[in-house]
Curated annotation (Swiss-Prot):
UniProt xrefs under PANTHER family: AB HYDROLASE SUPERFAMILY PROTEIN YCLE (PTHR43798:SF31), MONOACYLGLYCEROL LIPASE (PTHR43798)
EC number: 3.7.1.9
Protein's organism: Pseudomonas sp. (strain CF600)
One Pfam family matching this protein: Abhydrolase_1
Name of this chain's protein: 2-hydroxymuconate semialdehyde hydrolase
Length: 283
C-alpha cells in the first residue's frame, strides 16, 4: 500500500499466505507475535509502538499488519473472517520459518490469537489476551460505533474518547492523526467491508467454542481495562474461568487501551509472564 515517506508505521514486506504483508520485526530471542485490534486506520505500529521497544530487549518481536489492515495487501476478492485471519497469521510464522511463538492479541487480535492457539496448539508456547474478543457477548455501543465508523474528524474524536479512560491521552492532534490514517487510499473501503451492519454477527464470528477454549493447554495471561467501553470486562472473566491455565490482570482506571494507558506496566507484566517460559526452557 502507498505510505507516507519515512513513516514509522512501515516495517518490511514479506509474503505471508500469499498476501503482501507489512511487518515490524525487532529484537532477538524466542519470538513473540503481536496481533493488533480493529479500530479504523489501525496499524501494528499504532497499536504496539509504546511496548515493542521494551519487549524487544529480551525477545524477537513480530508485529504484522493483518490482511486488509494498515499497509498490508487488500486483494479485491478478499474474504474477511476469523479463519482467513488465522491463516494469515500462521502464514507470517511460516514465512519467517518460525515453528513456535508466543502470541499477544489485542481485542479483535485476541480473538484471532485464541483461534490460532485452538487450531494450531503446537505453534503457540504462551498466550496473552488483552481486552480480547473470542467469546460471544451482546455488542456494546462502543464496539458498534468503532466498527460503524464513518470518516470524519468529529467521529474520530468521539471514538478516541470511547477508547481511553484517561482523557488527557486524547486531543485534537491525535484525533487528526488517526482521522488522516483512516482515510488513506483503500483503508476505509476495506474496513467498511469487514464489519457491515448488523454487527452482532461479527462478534459471534470472532468467538471460539466454549469446549475448545476449555481444552486449551497453554499458559495464558488475560488482561483487561476495568473501564473498557468497547469489549466488556466480563469477556475476560469468562476467558479466565474457561482456560484452565489462565491468570487474570485487571487494570483499574483503564479503558480499551491497556498497552497505551499503562504501557510500562503492560510491558513489564507481559515480559515477566513470557520470561517464566524462557527460564523453564533453559533449566
Amino acid at each position: 500500500m502507498n505510505a507516507p515517506q519515512n513513516s514509522p508505521e512501515i516495517g518490511r514486506e514479506i509474503i505471508a499466505a500469499g498476501i503482501r504483508t507489512n511487518l515490524h520485526d525487532s529484537g532477538a530471542g524466542f519470538p513473540l507475535m503481536m496481533i493488533h485490534g480493529s479500530g479504523p486506520g489501525v496499524t501494528a505500529w499504532a497499536n504496539w509502538r509504546l511496548v515493542m521497544p521494551e519487549l524487544a530487549k529480551s525477545r524477537r518481536v513480530i508485529a504484522p499488519d493483518m490482511l486488509g489492515f494498515g499497509y498490508s495487501e487488500r486483494p479485491a476478492d478478499a474474504q474477511y473472517n476469523r479463519d482467513v485471519w488465522v491463516d494469515h497469521a500462521v502464514g507470517v510464522l511460516d514465512a519467517l520459518e518460525i515453528e513456535q511463538a508466543d502470541l499477544v492479541g489485542n481485542s479483535f487480535g485476541g480473538g484471532i490469537a485464541l483461534a490460532l492457539a485452538i487450531r494450531h496448539p503446537e505453534r503457540v508456547r504462551r498466550l496473552v489476551l488483552m481486552g480480547s474478543a473470542g467469546v460471544s457477548f451482546p455488542i456494546t455501543e462502543g464496539l458498534d460505533a468503532v466498527w460503524g465508523y464513518n470518516p470524519s474528524f468529529a467521529e474520530m474524536r468521539r471514538l478516541l474518547d470511547i477508547f481511553a479512560f484517561d482523557r488527557n491521552l486524547v486531543n485534537d492532534e491525535l484525533a487528526e492523526l488517526r482521522y488522516q490514517a483512516s482515510i488513506r487510499p483503500g483503508f476505509h473501503e476495506s474496513f467498511a467491508a469487514m464489519f457491515p451492519a448488523p454487527r452482532q454477527r461479527w462478534v459471534d464470528g470472532l468467538a471460539s467454542a466454549e469446549a475448545a477454549i476449555r481444552a486449551l493447554p497453554h499458559e495464558t495471561l488475560v488482561i483487561h481495562g476495568r473501564e473498557d467501553q468497547i469489549i466488556p470486562l466480563q469477556t475476560s472473566l469468562t476467558l479466565a474461568d474457561w482456560i484452565a491455565r489462565a491468570q487474570l490482570h485487571v487494570f483499574g482506571q483503564c479503558g480499551h487501551w491497556t498497552q497505551i494507558e499503562h504501557a510500562a506496566r503492560f510491558a513489564s507484566l507481559v515480559g515477566d509472564f513470557l520470561a517464566e517460559a524462557d527460564a523453564a526452557a533453559i533449566s
